[in-house]
């Protein structure tokens, strides 16, 4: 196996047996790919901005004398980069400029045909937020994610109510045509089997109204939907043209005979035998009695041959009179429609009878009345409305997806076609619905992933942009009609505000544009891969039923069956499976290996849920021989959503990987296959809540996915190109790029600036640390710096803790955990949290607020941490209530008493007209100030502190850019030096000269002289770029800030809070095994083993059997084995044993296992590399046990044996308090524990006095409102149950919300009089007012 430089430092032993056929794809491609489609120019105009422009332009004026054409668009460069936008609270966006052409026409006869004038102009159309490299958006300085939506695909869907609508249990069938844009069209049967249509879920109409509006007459309608039965009078006898198949299942009321042969006797039911006999004898006509014709329905209008009068209208039931009239008028052949009760219902015929419309105009008016109730219909308005509903491209669009789904549903050969509906489309849908009602065909499964598609960020942004463009279109049309065309320019016509507003509205306030979950790298990556069924055009929590939320067979390999939130959103918010991707139509696809004649190839095919239904697919854990052929004859496979046994020659495809069905978070749970699904769900969700700790530690037992997640999440720094580490410190890494990766015009230096102590969205700390050393050689793609929760380029959410499963004095009751004091001392779970506190200075009606250190009635001590401007120093340690930014607000003059006037006159005290509104540290928080940012409105003089901060920033930038320039110069002059030496210039003479003079030397060799000239130009360019960068940065830093109206100054103070683990904090493993810390126990009291090594955490063994998450036990055993191997290596290192011995032992550990795919040959490693590997393994050999393909029980035992530990995984423990041995052996091992972001510090809260609710006069609730306790309903019940009436009266009055009573009580207590006078509680007044609001007056007698 080939390892990268970083991987070689610490190789994870992989227990996976199945070959890795397909690498894990880039995990953020769903976000980046979709947005790329949106901003990238599409020459065909199918996607993105190009598609939106082409769909709206050209915009023509109402009278056709002018039009505005679209030519091209261009996205500019953003003014501020991502980091600057976050600091300044701005949106990371690029300006959109569009090339438009205004064409003015001249009247040529009756129409405008001749072009009079054209004018091209570039027009600004607002800003488009850009996606960062990690798939996020910076909106108003906040990092947000746009979640993909799983919505009902456009197309046609056939469904039924499953008999739930009516008490009779009759199944009513419906069809619904859903466009991508436009009106919905529903067809539905009622209880009487009449067929109705609804447009946009309005009042229903008989379906024949729609058909009549489509210009169908009664007989055309009947002929379209029914077969014809022809009856003929011959010699006073009535004959029927026979189609034998139609008689199946009928009981005949007469003998069917021909040529004197009786084929079916009267009263017999016609079977296949009779039909075959009739067909065999080629019987095409049979005699029928006259009464057989009674009640049959005529299929066409019969007109009098002489005068054209209507004798019988189509859809009339035949009676003797009608028959007599027809025969009398010379009609010997009578055509009726064919129907029966079994499989040819006469639904359309019955519907025609309840249809009151006669002409097309009647039908159009009826539709107009439904769509526009109250408006008087005219012929033109009714026609235009109907036309625009389904047949105009501007108003209706099925989209490519919709047309494809529509045509597939109707079994058409061609899957492409028009975006609008045609007559045939509507007719075919009605025909299929009638067929389903007749028992031919099935309804669709709406939860099938072939009927639900993914709408990603690019598509949603495009739709929103189109909405903005449509708003602009209306304004442009009006301006073209009203304005003076000779002076109008495209710039005058376009107002960018509606477009900006539409885009801003989407990114700021859409339900799918969400505040990014930035707890740790996994929560980031999961949030970006999330798929929501909620949001605009989707479902709502309240209306979503069980079926939509449930796992569907088509989710296999596309959507994770495990990871979904608990609570009201369960099943509505899902996560994308590891290998899933979307196809061009937006449907989810998953990869499979092609199987040919029982042999599995490495040919990968991606199949959507629709395509997958046709194939038989084997699972990834199916046994194969070396040639890739199936070993077993009968193999468990999936076909059409069901599992079954199939012969190996029947199989079409095989799964790519065992982890194909789960999401990223679920694939990080080792031994997932041994956990109950409910607990696995909790485990997957809780990993996302893990807080990054100060020192991340890789999991001893992992799944092999850790590296992919860490790299793809973007929190680590990955080398763009290979090379040698030239410089490294805590905040910067410089790499000298390999010669073969350098282009001619550049210096060949890559500089990586690391993030230091940045606040995340969840107030956790983002800090990057280099993991390379000076002089190391690295390759492209190597991890060169770790971020939060990563360790040597692997995801590290928690810590490996030595745990024991045993009860301990009741401290692990109900999932509690007993934790050793050593864990706290070693800072294993200590995390840093960064709080941002803002102080805003506004311009008020009474005058501007002022940020100052001169605050009235505040002592010197309280101001000791502020500078002269009134802003806290960096490095100050502050606690709750401390002033961070001093601020005074003007207040209105109050009427002064004579005494106050006298005092003011004597002492000249003027401070009373301002009040203290300083920013203070919230209660319960204590930390260190790590940064202060000051933003001042443009045009307002900056204070001393703001200028100092500016100066510091400028100096830092000059220093950084100067160092960058130095590095680039050094690299460039190295190349110049090499060139001059190779040209024969002496080394001594070069060293005596100034380096810049080297560039002016003249060389004999013309080629080398040209190269020197090129390097000289590069040097000048470097200098110029450096100067430009400094001037741009200077301008950015010194310019005023764009603040909201009325805001003069904003001061942001950043506090770093260090949180150690303490009782009340929530911790969890990866298997849904969560609990709260009950006690931090002294290390000497913890249970210890025979070597005196204490355990770190004691867990309750009763937490395992009922929860059925046995994965945690296996993880504990394997963790113990991994640590044992590390201990053995550590011992060898301490004894300074020779490298070969070390190499052999490590090689033996890596080789262990049956049929594992990993093949590591340590003989290819140098001694230095083996030594470095051993040093990294001494804390434990990291192990990967992939989901559904992990380590077996036997392999765990073998590893335990190799590490010299008992294979039972249990050891003898001693009580730390008494020193006595415990009665039986205890399961001890290493489990990866996470500290979750549910810290007791954030939840604990105390109050003595505080704010009250204005209405009820009771304390507010919750920590955020600094709330208190109220004596609530249930507490009242408790006192009532005890009959404690005096206590109850006291609680409900003076101790609660009797305002006067509690004031009197306070005075009485001060006076030493312990009497109480209960009054009227405020909540009783609320009740009285509620009752009065119902117009019932209640008055109380005194």
From Swiss-Prot:
Its EC number is 2.7.7.6. GO terms for cellular component: DNA-directed RNA polymerase complex. DNA-dependent RNA polymerase catalyzes the transcription of DNA into RNA using the four ribonucleoside triphosphates as substrates. GO terms for biological process: DNA-templated transcription. The gene is rpoB. It comes from the Bacteria. This is DNA-directed RNA polymerase subunit beta. The RNAP catalytic core consists of 2 alpha, 1 beta, 1 beta' and 1 omega subunit. When a sigma factor is associated with the core the holoenzyme is formed, which can initiate transcription. PANTHER family: DNA-DIRECTED RNA POLYMERASE I SUBUNIT 2.
